[in-house]
Amino acid sequence: MNPARCRILAVGKVRRGWIQDGIDLYLKRLPGLTISELRDSNPDKEADAIRAALRPDETLIALMEQGDTLASVPFAQRLEQFGNQRLAFVIGGADGLTAELKAQAQWRLSLSPMTFPHELARLMLVEQLFRAQAIVQGSPYHRA
């Protein structure tokens, strides 16, 4: 997994300092990974902003409650299957993603069957991306 070929498109801002501290910690460990914040609005406007922010060469990965739920090792393996493709992980706002955007996604991913605030999902995703990199590299960070 190459963090420089990944980015996160997230609707809304992180409002809790401790969550931002955690995100920043993992971003430092994943050089090249970026997070683009999009203004929160109604779901249709958010979907338009997401589509406008997507690059033509990016693979859209939508984070959603009904997506595939994977343990960390299969998640790392799945990311490896994407090879050198550019990946855009999309985290919707409070109302989630539109049905059209979900259908457009090449992969629909769930971090858990539980629902979390979108800012916490951001922290969980960057940690899992770091863990995936550690798994692929054989780092002791992941001790399963």
Curated annotation (Swiss-Prot):
Its main location: cytoplasm. It holds the Pfam family SPOUT_MTase. It is found in: Cytoplasm. S-adenosyl-L-methionine binds at L63, G92, L111, S112, P113, M114, T115, F116. It is an enzyme of class 2 (transferase). GO terms for molecular function: rRNA (pseudouridine-N3-)-methyltransferase activity. The keyword Transferase applies. Belongs to the RNA methyltransferase RlmH family. This is Ribosomal RNA large subunit methyltransferase H. The lineage of its organism: Bacteria, Bacillati, Cyanobacteriota, Cyanophyceae, Synechococcales.
